[in-house]
Amino acid sequence: MNLKKFPRHVLTFGPTPIQPLKRLSAHLGGKVDLYAKREDCNSGLAFGGNKTRKLEYLIPEALEGGYDTLVSIGGIQSNQTRQVAAVAAHLGLKCVLVQENWVNYSDAVYDRVGNIEMSRIMGADVRLDAAGFDIGIRQSWEQAMADVRAAGGKPFPIPAGCSEHPRGGLGSVGFAEEVRQQEAELGFKFDYLVVCSVTGSTQAGMVVGFAADGRADRVIGIDASAKPQQTFEQILRIAKNTAELVELGRDITEKDVVLDRRFGGPEYGLPNEGTLEAIRLSARFEGMLTDPVYEGKSMHGMIEKVRLGEFPAGSKVLYAHLGGVPALNAYSFLFRNG
């Protein structure tokens, strides 16, 4: 496998810490040892997150190609768009963000706080759009790029989650290589890794990265899109492409992609009772905050799998905390009593 052949523009601090979740593990019976890899602490650029790791492999193309405007898309509380805005500010580039109405959640402050507030503060041109949720290429995003060109600019396209970009999975291959290095220092290997999946490239890159040592199917994706078949197909397609790019040496098949479909409901961006319980448990036992859109759902999935005995006793499980906490502010009504 050859990741080093791709240029990387460093936007992160370095290897993210792996934190033992001792109190949460004990609360859930103590038969499984839970850990978290804190991607939510990976950068000083507006709180960072998994998209910042991905952007390290996209930004060289933007800089080398003389692009002057980063153009991205997401929901109103998109972590992706916040991280793109931060990178643009850091590099002195312009930024246009399309924020679609992906979540059926009504709150007077939903489009004024959290991620979207930070993007505005960082100087991004934020454009609200009424279109609903989908993980594919969007007409509103293409129109934003056309608008930049019409104004004499040179737009660099960054799709939702970086996922439709050919190099969108490379950062998560690097995540897997980083975990392997940390495992050597810890003196043990993780039996499973739990990660949230929506647009697919995070899990896809991890599948490829861990396929290098035979653990592709130990990457357990927790669907948060509530459109799991579409997400599964996108993970598989991106993983196949990424495996070819990094010269993995074998094809990625459906058996390599594990996506748990039980925890994404009722809709994208809307938490269920299990999501809310998981957010509170993580916060109250570990002081680790998660959000209702992504990490709360993957945390719910991990907790429930422990409760159901789906991880064998003695397993060491690594939870990939991808970020997303700024969105909590947009859901403040749900937590008005804690």
Swiss-Prot record:
Q: Sum up the protein's function in the record's words.
A: Catalyzes a cyclopropane ring-opening reaction, the irreversible conversion of 1-aminocyclopropane-1-carboxylate (ACC) to ammonia and alpha-ketobutyrate. Allows growth on ACC as a nitrogen source.
Q: What PANTHER family would the database entry show?
A: 1-AMINOCYCLOPROPANE-1-CARBOXYLATE DEAMINASE-RELATED
* Keyword RNA-binding listed: no
Q: In which domain of life is the source organism classified?
A: Bacteria
Q: Which Pfam families match?
A: PALP
Q: Give the multimer and partner information.
A: Homotrimer.
Q: Which Gene3D superfamilies match?
A: 3.40.50.1100
Spans traversing the lipid bilayer: none
GO terms in the biological process aspect are:
1-aminocyclopropane-1-carboxylate metabolic process; amine catabolic process
Q: Which HAMAP family match?
A: ACC_deaminase
A GO term for molecular function: pyridoxal phosphate binding
Q: Residues where N6-(pyridoxal phosphate)lysine occurs? A: 51
**SUPFAM superfamilies per UniProt:** Tryptophan synthase beta subunit-like PLP-dependent enzymes
Q: What is this protein called?
A: 1-aminocyclopropane-1-carboxylate deaminase
Catalytic activity reads: 1-aminocyclopropane-1-carboxylate + H2O = 2-oxobutanoate + NH4(+)
